[in-house]
Amino acid sequence: GNLDQEIQKILLTVDVTQAVVDEAINLKADLILAHHPFLLKGVNSIQEQSSKGSVVSKLIKHDIALFSAHTNADVQLNGTSVEIAKRLGLRSLRPLIQTPVGYGIGVVGETDLSMLELAAALDVNIPQTATGIRGTGDFDDVLKKVAICAGAGDSYLQEALDSGADLYITSDLRHHPALEIMEQAKARGINFNLLDIPHWAAEYVWLERAKSDLESTGLEIEICDIRTDVFNFLINLPP
């Protein structure tokens, strides 16, 4: 966008899609503030007939600026993971990966909740999705320390285990990394478990925090009501 453009209305969203841009146009928003980068991977063309090109064209034609927060929102003190931790009532929060000290990806905090109590609290504090929450462990397990990385976090499975956490909450867990860390925990005699929550839902809660923070500027702030979670049904038949 134009750095000199005057901003009066901001639309907050997790992802930038054609439908989200259409909503921004209808709302007469001046800026879309997204969590995920629009061009997460490079493109060779932005012709209007392509999905990316269509979005770029609409943004330019309607003078709508676009800003993507992503890891800037992940590492801040009121970032994506911290927002989930606060909603779960975790105490003594610290970054999972500190760079620099005091800031970083993910969060680790203390709790006295059981696995069932924490999973239930998580379920009511993130948007409902078709795929829901997947987990390992026993509902009666009493937790002491929980690690969280909002968004795709299986690259930090080792750090979560080494942090002393009983439970790691993240998204997009793949079979092999998850299985390997669980086997490693068993070999070390550690009761370590996982909760896999929907990626979109995990980061949507940050939009509500961002709205609250930005409203102090006097600007008009809207949260996009378009669900960009990819999945819309789940088949889970009994064996």
Residue positions per predicted region:
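Hydrophobic structural segments
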Residues: 1-239
